[in-house]
């Protein structure tokens, strides 16, 4: 049986984390530079569509996710970052739906 699209997406997230974590230092954690590269290489349109391309946004995400303040992001902390990004994108998705609905029904 083949993986579902969601299962494949989850596998790709895990693989991507480890691919970037292995670039320097600990293979089980991301540095700030590794996180920046991961997000900008793999989600450039996503980050741009959120209006989040400014370098300080990723730094703020890193600091908020680094719960044990070791200046590294473990996989659990990485999931916090993904959750935050998905929530932001979900809100944007609803704003776009509302804007489309309002435009179609002359509510502006």
Swiss-Prot record:
Alphabetized GO MF terms: calcium ion binding; calcium-dependent protein binding; chemoattractant activity; transition metal ion binding
Superkingdom of source: Eukaryota
Residue positions binding Ca(2+): 66, 68, 70, 72, 77
Any one of the GO CC terms: cytoplasm
GO terms under biological process: endothelial cell migration
Annotated organism of origin: Pongo abelii (Sumatran orangutan)
Taxonomic lineage from the root: Eukaryota, Metazoa, Chordata, Craniata, Vertebrata
SUPFAM superfamilies, A to Z: EF-hand
Family annotation (Pfam families): S_100
Keyword list, A-Z: Calcium, Metal-binding, Zinc
PROSITE patterns: EF_HAND_1, EF_HAND_2
Name the UniProt record assigns to this protein: Protein S100-A15A
EF-hand domain boundaries: 53-88
Disulfide bonds: none
């Amino acid at each position: 049986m083949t993986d579902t699209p969601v299962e494949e997406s989850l596998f790709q997230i895990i693989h991507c984390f480890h691919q970037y974590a292995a670039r320097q230092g600990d293979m089980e954690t991301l540095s700030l530079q590794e996180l920046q590269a991961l997000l900008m290489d793999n989600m450039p349109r996503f980050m741009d569509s959120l209006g989040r391309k400014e370098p300080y946004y990723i730094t703020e995400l890193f600091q908020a996710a680094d719960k044990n303040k070791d200046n590294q992001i473990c996989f659990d902390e990485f999931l916090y970052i993904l959750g935050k990004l998905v929530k932001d994108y979900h809100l944007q998705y609803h704003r776009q739906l509302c804007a489309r609905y309002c435009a179609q029904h002359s509510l502006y």
